[in-house]
Amino acid sequence: SLTGKAGLSGTSVTLNGTLGLSGTGEKSIQSLSGSGTLALNGGTLSVTSASARNGSFSGTLDGEGRIDVSGSGNQVMQTGSSTYDLGVHGGGTLVLKGTSAAPALDYRNVAVGSAGTLRIEAIGHDAGDSNTSLNVGSIDFQSGSTTEFVYNLSASDPFGSAMLTADSITIGNGAGFSLANMEGNTGLGTYDNLDGVVLMTADTIDGLTEGESMSVGTSGLFAVYYKDATMSREGNHIVLNATVQQDNIFTPAVNSHNSGAGSELLWEAKNNLDATSQLGQAMHSISTMITGD
């Protein structure tokens, strides 16, 4: 427990016991890992680094507080608390990822600021792994922010429920959104157009009027299977719409007879690929390099 003028500055923390921060000293670290207990006692912990740092915390958030992520780091939170706030901005990446025991994460307020990336990521890539469900009081997607929804396309019903539920959602002008899949996903099997798939839901939505839509970026298998992805407001829901990709997207890269045959083989097999097969591995490698509008 650090009280008085004691504090933390410029270190990576692996927390497997209990850390209480209640003093007036600086509370700034490069990354947070472990499965212990963090008690901020109403204060703010800054997670920031000028170099690439990765942290993953799955412990307990005790009391009240705020965690603020910035810089070049990648901070994963596999736990939550309805009395904690989150912020990400200034180059930082915040990954919210549930577990099989707790696929839903709760937070009080979340702010995704300029040059910050929020990633809501499924708990895994296997058939029995669900998407992460984020529940918050409020979330503010500010101008210049990026939010990525990472689905497990191996799940039996990957689009069956919203990935974000909030009391209020604010979408700033210039906020960006994108869709991605988990590494290890190799296909969707049978699939149709995405038509009114609920992505987010809230009692109050500001920044997106009824019926208004905005484009959503795609990467990986979403770019393979779909085109013209958008999200629009329908009442208290923000829903996804996208059209099935009919044309072989690998064709523009063909520069020989062999590569042409390979592109046709991969395209025709895209609905039923074993992750351990050579085609499955090829699809994984190629799809991770694909982005779409």
Give, region by region, the residue ranges found by the protein language model.
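Short loop/beta submotifs within extracellular cysteine-rich repeat domains
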Residues: 2, 7-8, 22, 75-78, ...
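Outer-membrane translocation/initiation segment of Type V secreted surface proteins
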Residues: 178-293
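Extracellular beta-strand/loop-rich repeat segments of large surface/secreted proteins
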Residues: 46-53, 63-71, 79, 83-85, ...
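Glycine-centered positions in the ABC transporter ATPase nucleotide-binding domain
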Residues: 1, 17-19, 43, 73, ...
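GD-rich hexapeptide-repeat beta-solenoids
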Residues: 21-59, 73
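Short, exposed beta-strand/loop patches in secreted or surface proteins that constitute
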Residues: 12, 37-38, 86, 110-111, ...
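Tandem-repeat/low-complexity and Cys-motif detector
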Residues: 11, 36-39, 59-62, 83-85, ...
